[in-house]
């Protein structure tokens, strides 16, 4: 929907409708809510993974340290060392996996922030561009209106000066001059077309030879 407002010499200038601006703001709000929901889902996924790892670690702690129960029959000191080393290795791998997940999550968050900043900058630039275009359009309309008013005033003064008959004869003379200029331009166009056809014919003849 477009409203119209009177400005200066204008009678009807279209301006943005408040309903259109409200719809645009609602759409932006819905997009922001959708992005926040996606972020929360990612956070919940990472937290669920961390809680699972934490519960697994607590379960191992409740079962007691490796030396808390008698080693299997026939197990040597070297076997116990190997099992302890494997356990440390698995723990280190889990910690690395946790760090990797956290780093990936933080990276996604930073990328999302960068995308939001970029969209906000693009939106601000687009708004500024549209505002500038609207201002230029209004100024152009104002200049056109001022020029028309000036021409109308000049014609009115000329008509008052020459009278209706004199002004009519002047207009007829201007029309005859414009018609003569139009005939001259048409003749120049015909001459140019004839010259083009002449050279085109010569080129075609050369190619055929």
Swiss-Prot record:
A motif (Nuclear localization signal 2) lies at residues 116-120. The keyword Cell membrane does not apply. A motif (Nuclear localization signal 3) lies at residues 137-141. InterPro entries: HTLV1ZIPPER. A motif (Nuclear localization signal 1) lies at residues 87-92. Belongs to the HTLV-1 HBZ protein family. Interacts with host ATF4; this interaction inhibits viral RNA transcriptional activation by preventing ATF4 binding to Tax-responsive elements. Interacts with host CREB1; this interaction inhibits host CREB1 transcriptional activity. Interacts with host JUN, JUNB and JUND. Interacts with host EP300 and CREBBP; these interactions inhibit the association of the coactivators with the viral promoter. Interacts with host UBR5; this interaction regulates HBZ protein stability. Interacts with XRCC5 and XRCC6. Interacts with IRF7 and IKBKE; this interaction modulates host interferon signaling. Enhances viral infectivity and persistence, and facilitates proliferation of HTLV-1-infected lymphocytes. Mechanistically, inhibits Tax-mediated viral replication and NF-kappa-B activation. Plays a role in allowing infected T-cells to escape the cytotoxic T-lymphocyte response by maintaining low levels of viral protein production. Also inhibits host EP300 histone acetyltransferase (HAT) activity, reducing levels of acetylated histone H3 at 'Lys-18' (H3K18ac) in infected cells. This is HTLV-1 basic zipper factor.
């Amino acid at each position: 929907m477009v409203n119209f407002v009177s400005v200066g010499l204008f009678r009807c200038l279209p301006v943005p409708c408040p309903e259109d601006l409200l719809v645009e703001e609602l759409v932006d709000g819905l997009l922001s809510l959708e992005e926040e929901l996606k972020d929360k889902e990612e956070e919940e996924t990472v937290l669920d993974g961390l809680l699972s790892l934490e519960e697994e670690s607590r379960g191992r702690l409740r079962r007691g340290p490796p030396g808390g129960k008698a080693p299997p029959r026939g197990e040597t000191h070297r076997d116990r060392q190997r099992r302890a080393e494997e356990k440390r290795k698995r723990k280190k791998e889990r910690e690395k996996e946790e760090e990797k997940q956290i780093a990936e999550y933080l990276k996604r968050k930073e990328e999302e922030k960068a995308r939001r900043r970029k969209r906000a900058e693009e939106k601000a630039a687009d708004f500024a561009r549209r505002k500038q275009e609207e201002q230029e359009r209004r100024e152009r309309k104002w200049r056109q209106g001022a020029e028309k008013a000036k021409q109308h005033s000049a014609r009115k003064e000329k008509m008052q000066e020459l009278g209706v008959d004199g002004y009519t004869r002047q207009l007829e003379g201007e029309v005859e001059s414009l018609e003569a200029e139009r005939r001259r331009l048409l003749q120049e166009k015909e001459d140019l077309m004839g010259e083009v056809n002449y050279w085109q014919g010569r080129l075609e003849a050369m190619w055929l030879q």
